């Protein structure tokens, strides 16, 4: 860690010189501790990720970045305690089992994991979960416990002001309909509404884009399929919207374990007076973009 500490300022100067305005830091270590120099010499000291020494280190990194107007997205971070209010360049972090555990974790994250995160980890602050794995495959072909539509819904249910398109480009080329939502979804929100939910079972979140009149909705479930009635009263009254719907297929047995790629993209006209019926497959989800039809953005 001392090698990082000694070079942080120089590294941030380099990034600033090349116009880099954001960095993602990481502190992966297999045994859960990082090494630092022993001031007395001899055997290096070992520090826990959430210990005081690492808390000071993370704050030092964010302060150095802030002086150069560089944003920080920390992986293997300390927990969010509200200091992102003091340092708004501390834009996101992980701080829980992220999508990478679906790539190589034994076991991977079960379907209820992301639902639980909405009621636990995400209450503390933004989480860089790195959704959008449309291949639904991890290391050595390990299946990710998710449907394709669920990967899109995670962009709305798990808040982060910076999001990743975390899959390979060739996989997005194979799923252009799904990738369209990733291109369109906002990350900077003006309003957030929790429409329904039970801890560990299901949740539906709606958010309004800060830079347009568009609304986005994400709904996810655990390993059980669900049929949810969602009133659209959050939409602007008196305005007709085009609902661009990305959902699990309903007539072809969509299921995260047996048929995760069953997927439908469709459009409907709706208003704030309507109620949508969301059919979520086991381990599935639904993502919707609501665009005003009056042409006013």
What does each model-identified segment do?
Residues 1-136, 143:
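Aromatic- and carboxylate-enriched substrate-binding clefts and catalytic-loop regions
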Residues 1-4, 30-34, 79-86, 136-139, ...:
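Flexible loop/turn segments at secondary-structure boundaries
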Residues 11, 60-61, 142-145, 192-193, ...:
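Generic recognition of flexible, low-complexity loop/linker segments
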Residues 24, 69-76, 100-104, 161-175, ...:
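Acidic/polar loop patches that form or flank catalytic/metal-binding clefts of enzymes
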Residues 26, 72, 157, 217, ...:
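Conserved, mostly hydrophobic/aromatic
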Residues 141, 150-169:
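Catalytic domains of carbohydrate-active enzymes that cleave complex glycans
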Residues 167-216, 222, 251-261:
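Glycan-recognition and catalytic regions of carbohydrate-active enzymes
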Residues 223-297:
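C-terminal beta-sandwich/jelly-roll accessory domains of carbohydrate-active enzymes
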């Amino acid at each position: 860690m001392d090698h990082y500490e000694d070079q942080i300022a120089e590294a941030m100067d380099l990034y600033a010189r090349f116009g880099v305005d954001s960095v993602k830091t990481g502190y992966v270590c297999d045994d859960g501790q990082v090494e630092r120099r022993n001031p007395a010499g001899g055997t290096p000291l070992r520090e826990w990720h959430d210990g005081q020494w690492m808390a000071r280190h993370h704050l030092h990194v964010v302060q150095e970045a802030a002086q150069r107007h560089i944003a920080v997205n920390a992986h293997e971070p300390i927990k969010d305690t509200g200091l992102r209010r003091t340092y708004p360049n501390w834009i996101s972090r992980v701080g829980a089992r992220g999508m990478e555990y679906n790539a190589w974790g034994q076991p991977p994250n079960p379907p209820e994991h992301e639902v639980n995160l909405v009621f636990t980890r995400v209450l503390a602050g933004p989480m860089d979960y790195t959704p959008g794995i449309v291949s639904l495959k991890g290391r050595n072909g390990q299946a990710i416990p998710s449907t394709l539509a669920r990967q899109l819904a995670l962009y709305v249910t798990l808040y982060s002001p910076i999001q990743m398109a975390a899959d390979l480009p060739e996989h997005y080329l194979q799923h252009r309909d799904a990738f369209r939502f990733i291109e369109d979804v906002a990350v900077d929100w003006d309003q957030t509404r929790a429409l329904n939910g039970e801890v560990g079972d299901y949740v539906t979140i709606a958010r309004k884009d800060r830079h347009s009149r568009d609304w986005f909705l994400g709904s996810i479930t655990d390993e059980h399929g669900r049929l949810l009635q969602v009133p659209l009263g959050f939409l602007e009254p008196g305005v007709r919207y085009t609902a661009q719907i990305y959902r699990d297929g309903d007539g072809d047995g969509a299921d995260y374990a047996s048929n995760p790629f069953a997927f439908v993209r469709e459009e409907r006209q709706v208003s704030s007076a309507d109620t949508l019926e969301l059919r979520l497959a086991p381990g599935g989800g639904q993502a919707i973009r609501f665009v005003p039809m009056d042409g006013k953005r």
